[in-house]
Amino acid sequence: MSGLLGKSSPAKRVDGNNDLPMYYVNPMSVEPQGRPSDTTRVSVTFAEHLMNVEDARNDESASSRALGIASPINSAASSFNSWASAPASSISSSPFVLSFTDLTYSVKIQKKFNPLACCRRSGNDSSVNTKILLNGISGEAREGEMMAVLGASGSGKSTLIDALANRIAKDSLRGSITLNGEVLESSMQKVISAYVMQDDLLFPMLTVEETLMFSAEFRLPRSLSKKKKKARVQALIDQLGLRSAAKTVIGDEGHRGVSGGERRRVSIGNDIIHDPIILFLDEPTSGLDSTSAYMVIKVLQRIAQSGSIVIMSIHQPSYRIMGLLDQLIFLSKGNTVYSGSPTHLPQFFSEFKHPIPENENKTEFALDLIRELEYSTEGTKPLVEFHKQWRAKQAPSYNNNNKRNTNVSSLKEAITASISRGKLVSGATNNNSSNLTPSFQTFANPFWIEMIVIGKRAILNSRRQPELLGMRLGAVMVTGIILATMFTNLDNSPKGAQERLGFFAFAMSTTFYTCAEAIPVFLQERYIFMRETAYNAYRRSSYVLSQSIISIPALIVLSASFAATTFWAVGLDGGANGFFFFYFTILASFWAGSSFVTFLSGVIPNVMLGFTVVVAILAYFLLFSGFFISRDRIPVYWLWFHYISLVKYPYEGVLQNEFQNPTRCFARGVQLFDNSPLGEFPNDVKVNLLKSMSGVLGTNVTAETCVTTGIDILKQQGITDISKWNCLWITVAWGFFFRVLFYFTLLIGSKNKRK
């Protein structure tokens, strides 16, 4: 170790490097606390190791590589192994201790409706049951240790992890949770902790290295150089054992990528990029084979030994995994049936008169016994009571063997010492100021940086899936070709005018229906977004604005393709000016449609239900657009739906663009009788009828007299109150309106907290 660090002590190297990566904590005004001398330290922290690795990389020469001489980077790597395996007790002179006492959480469950029970119900009966998920859970987790919460399905494992991770509303959870004796503020906990969900929520077409780098750009501050961020990512890849998979895409059902165990380690790396003090994990080994599960827990052990508190729920750990765990909590229906070291399990169950047989997995035996008791008459109540007595009996011995508990520093002192040691990854440094205290920012980066990173990640992920845009473009082109061939070169007859109305109605509704693909796209990102915003990786407003901006280029391509395919083939009027208005109306329709569907995808979390709702609502929009029934004939109680129809405004805009020329005629003389029984008579008869009508009307009506202009058609459709440009701007405004609603949906619906 001394050979790697040279003559400088670890603390001196850290304090002397103003570029040392630490998390976004600003040291300000607190009295410096006395720390043990550097000579008492037998381990380097992760940040120190990171600095050494980077220095070694900078010093490595081409000649040493050519001659096969061991390079400084190899020495740094060996230092990493020593650091990773260092005993937890040597890591920190100011340890962190997370304590929780009497945690109780219950939910109200509505009884199923029973008509017979309703008839018999007395006045005191209630239709609501209360289910206790946590019942007086207490415990303590220390820096450098791993605590595992075990139990059968429904025992309360995930609920306890959520409670400790501040994912349950405070007014619903009773009890206390403290770090070094102080209640954690929500804003501080988001900065110094991380939560790894059970599902691996990753962008499929990003590589492992890119995934972690984007996480670094989100969680590490702008003040930290790109070089330092890359160094942190490279060191984390080595720590997670992902070097061989660094350039491999994550993958999904349609794209081959990393293995399940590697995917899980990437998920963990995503959330620990900022080197958190506390790490919560919900069943990190779920769905993995025994080898992959062991590797994941081994990685978590390294993270704990770097100076973190690791708390996880785990279903049924193997014998090898048990050897890595420091503290266990067994739960049964929300009650603690055992808490303590794995080494005390045999003694505990032996005193409970259920000794663990020799050569049997201790956790499997405990879980099987708990399961048997749950189905017995008394349930697990005897075991719960015995555990309370056993803990009370063990308390004096436990306290004597753990006198270090009394030496826990205050939270402020511990965090300040952690910054001094380089534990937290931030742009702040420990200078020689006489007063230092950590000050936490809500977000690591400014708004515009977040927007750039979100957009860059989304574009990179989409660029590697060209089939998504290709399918949308193909659908739009096929629809455009079908319409162009069905409505080729429409004439200016009454039938031609009617066919134009049909073309516009179908064209406008098509633009909205093709936007339905946004539902699975956002739902794929929904839980990634929830995970990242839960710990303030970026602002929700940054996500909404960035996603809105990067969606526009695709909409421009789709709009141009559809407009170019149909406008001249159908024979629409207006020349170049008419074409550009038609194009911008199509673009505005795509914008409004994608915004509307994006908003609904934020409200409805199910793909199939989302498609059903979107298709139904768009059908209603088309029904009330004015094509099937004019505004004047819509019942007054449905008129409001006409005005909120997204199809109404682009439909009326393109109709005005087509029929605004007052000199353009769509019915002359004898064409007046088309679409009526008189239309079957010879032209001579029709001419005589026109002469007779002229005498009655007092106006000469000949076979060439224009009887219906474009303006007349607009009046027949009831399109007289809004200009075509206003229709365009209203359509654009609808798009912005639904984006704002989408933002509030994310703001309200992504709190990641149980009620």
Swiss-Prot record:
UniProt keyword annotation of ATP-binding present: yes
Name the predominant localization. Answer: membrane
Q: Which Pfam families match?
A: ABC2_membrane (PF01061), ABC2_membrane_7 (PF19055), ABC_tran (PF00005)
Query: Does the record's keyword annotation contain Membrane?
Result: yes
Binding of ATP: at which residues? G151, A152, S153, G154, S155, G156, K157, S158
According to UniProt, the name of this protein is ABC transporter G family member 2
Q: Which is a Gene Ontology cellular component entry for this protein?
A: membrane
Q: Which residue windows are transmembrane per the record?
A: 468-488, 503-523, 552-572, 579-599, 609-629, 728-748
Annotated ABC transmembrane type-2 domain ranges read 449-659
State the family it belongs to.
Belongs to the ABC transporter superfamily. ABCG family. Eye pigment precursor importer (TC 3.A.1.204) subfamily.
List the PROSITE patterns. ABC_TRANSPORTER_1, ABC_TRANSPORTER_2
Which ranges carry the ABC transporter domain?
A: 98-358
Q: Which residues form the signal peptide?
A: none
GO BP terms: namely: suberin biosynthetic process
Query: Do you know which InterPro entries this protein is assigned to?
Result: AAA+_ATPase, ABC2_TM, ABC_transporter-like_ATP-bd, ABC_transporter-like_CS, ABCG_dom, ABCG_transporters, P-loop_NTPase, Pigment_permease/Abcg
Q: Where is this gene product found?
A: Membrane
Q: Which gene encodes it?
A: ABCG2
The UniProt entry lists membrane topology as: Multi-pass membrane protein
Keywords attached to this entry = ATP-binding, Membrane, Nucleotide-binding, Transmembrane, Transmembrane helix, Transport
PANTHER family for the chain: ABC TRANSPORTER G FAMILY MEMBER 2, ABC TRANSPORTER G FAMILY MEMBER 28
Kindly list the organism's lineage. Answer: Eukaryota, Viridiplantae, Streptophyta, Embryophyta, Tracheophyta
A GO term for molecular function: ATP hydrolysis activity
